[in-house]
Curated annotation (Swiss-Prot):
Residues 102-320 are annotated as: Domain III, AAA+ region. Residues 321-456 are annotated as: Domain IV, binds dsDNA. ATP binds at residues 150, 152-154. Keywords: ATP-binding, Cytoplasm, DNA replication, DNA-binding, Lipid-binding, Nucleotide-binding. This is Chromosomal replication initiator protein DnaA 1. Pfam families: Bac_DnaA, Bac_DnaA_C. The gene is dnaA1. NCBIfam families: PRK12422.1. GO terms for cellular component: cytoplasm; plasma membrane. InterPro entries: AAA+_ATPase, Chromosome_initiator_DnaA, Chromosome_initiator_DnaA-like, Chromosome_initiator_DnaA_CS, DnaA_C, DnaA_dom, DnaA_N_sf, P-loop_NTPase. The lineage of its organism: Bacteria, Pseudomonadati, Chlamydiota, Chlamydiia, Chlamydiales.
């Protein structure tokens, strides 16, 4: 249909031909009846992408010959038949009946190892929980915690949530991904009023990984109004991210400014010694005995990733109990034997140059061979430069070593990395480079999520 094709041409100018071809032209036109356009996506992920990135543009730009807006309905290939009433009802009520975010009772302030590096965020969150528990206002709202993966942000947030709930404060604890999924579901089922009531009729909102909203205009718009509603009523907001507010890419300036209204607190990861002390305390709680060099080996094998280490120790305790070895001192050989599957998985997903190349290729929709090849097409040059930049940033590889990986001389590597750095310094949060680097950084920082599933 002409209106749809004109809309696609407009989007090519705004978001690029490659993106349109990948996400929009692959949508199948099922039917058009002057005021309604029915599209079929290949899967539910494409539907979600459409709702996040295109829905608001459709409302503004897709008009029929009579000047009336065209309503677009998108279903996925595996759900191309109309929804049954029961399916619609289930989608409508799924998040309204959800518990207000499960927390781990082990993640308390008492179980958090306080070090000079993280003393400030601990004191702030403790004071926040104490004041809020007593029904008093806290001088900083919102509290914005930022720091790398496994620095303790989740632990601190859950500790504060636990205290507030014990005091009867209605506290919602969610991830940004869950907020996004709830929003998409509400849009599709026509339940936006109930969605807004669910998120705004609380006394405190804790939301993790706010960088997940980067590049998602519709979700940012809704969160902006959610934030304003809560803040205006003096309700408490705590946010976490791997990025400081000013370092968020593809995030609306008005949101960033609001994140800075209260206090932004860096959360530093434990030092090697602090991590070891923390794990030793956990080992004692699990009633197992591990020889010091065996613990050092485990820390090294799991790259000091605290969440994976905690899961591994829990798994070890279960297997020790099963084999009735609770009173036996475990040496490195014992740990290797008891956690063989865990250690093999860790080795498989260890961050390497080839892993960065694969992740970059997947993000940009090209093959690793394209990135490592000789083509100078922009379709391949940009992913190649980003991959080089990430090898430098994440692995601290020398220019010569990166050149060996990509079969380039070191001067080419330097110019490629410099090109990406300059584009990032331009501070265009909506650029392909900024969005790509931020999303890949998040994915690579979360590389051990699959390991966590293995050792649960």
């Amino acid at each position: 249909m002409r209106a749809w094709e004109e809309f696609l041409l407009l989007q090519e100018k705004e978001i690029g031909t490659d993106t349109v071809n990948k996400w929009l032209r692959s949508l199948k036109v099922l039917c058009f009846d002057a005021c309604n356009l029915y599209l079929e996506a290949k899967d539910s992920f494409q539907v979600t992408w459409f709702e996040e990135h295109i829905r608001h543009k459709v409302k503004a730009n897709l008009i029929n010959n009579n000047g009336k807006p065209i309503r677009v309905r998108v279903t996925s290939l595996d759900k191309s038949t109309p929804f049954k009433e029961s399916q619609i009802q289930q989608e409508k009520t799924a998040y309204f009946t959800m518990q207000y975010g499960d927390i781990d009772p082990q993640m308390s302030f008492a179980n958090f190892l306080v070090t000079p590096e993280n003393d400030l965020p601990v004191r702030i969150l403790q004071e926040f929980a104490k004041v809020s528990e007593q029904g008093k206002g806290f001088p900083f709202n919102p509290i914005y915690l930022f720091g790398p993966e496994s620095s303790g942000k989740t632990h601190l947030m859950q500790a504060a949530v636990g205290i507030l709930r014990e005091a009867g404060v209605k506290t919602l604890y969610v991830s940004s991904q869950l907020f996004t999924e709830h929003l998409v579901s509400a849009i599709r089922s026509g339940e936006m009023q109930r969605f807004r009531a669910f998120y705004r009729n609380v006394e405190a909102l804790f939301i993790e990984d706010i960088e997940v909203l980067s590049g998602k205009g519709a979700t940012q718009e809704e969160f902006f109004h959610t934030f304003n509603s809560l803040h205006t009523e003096g309700k408490l907001i705590v946010i976490s991210s791997i990025f400081a507010p000013g370092d968020l890419k593809a995030m609306e300036e008005r949101l960033i400014s609001r994140f800075e209204w209260g206090i932004a607190v860096p959360v530093s990861p434990l030092t090697r010694e602090g991590l070891k002390s923390f794990l030793e305390r956990r080992i004692e709680q699990l009633n197992i005995r591990i020889e010091e060099t065996a613990l050092d080996f485990l820390i090294q094998a799991l790259s000091s990733h605290i969440k994976s280490l905690l899961h591994a120790l829990t798994t070890l305790a279960k297997r020790v109990a099963y084999k009735k070895l609770s009173h036996q001192l475990l040496y490195q050989g014992d740990v290797e034997a008891l956690l063989q599957d865990v250690l093999q998985a860790a080795e498989h997903i260890r961050l390497t140059p080839s892993g960065i190349v694969r992740a970059t290729a997947q993000y940009y929709g090209v093959s690793p061979e394209n990135i490592l090849g000789r083509s100078q097409s922009r379709e391949y040059v940009l992913p190649r430069q980003v991959a080089m930049f990430l090898c430098r940033q994440k692995l601290s590889l020398s220019y010569v070593k990166i050149g060996e990986v990509f079969s380039r001389d070191h001067s080419t590597v330097i110019s490629s990395i410099r090109a990406i750095s300059q584009k990032l310094d331009e501070d265009d949060r909506e650029s392909d480079v900024s969005c790509g680097v931020q999303e890949l950084t998040k994915r690579l920082s979360s590389a051990y999520q699959s390991l966590d599933l293995i050792v649960d």
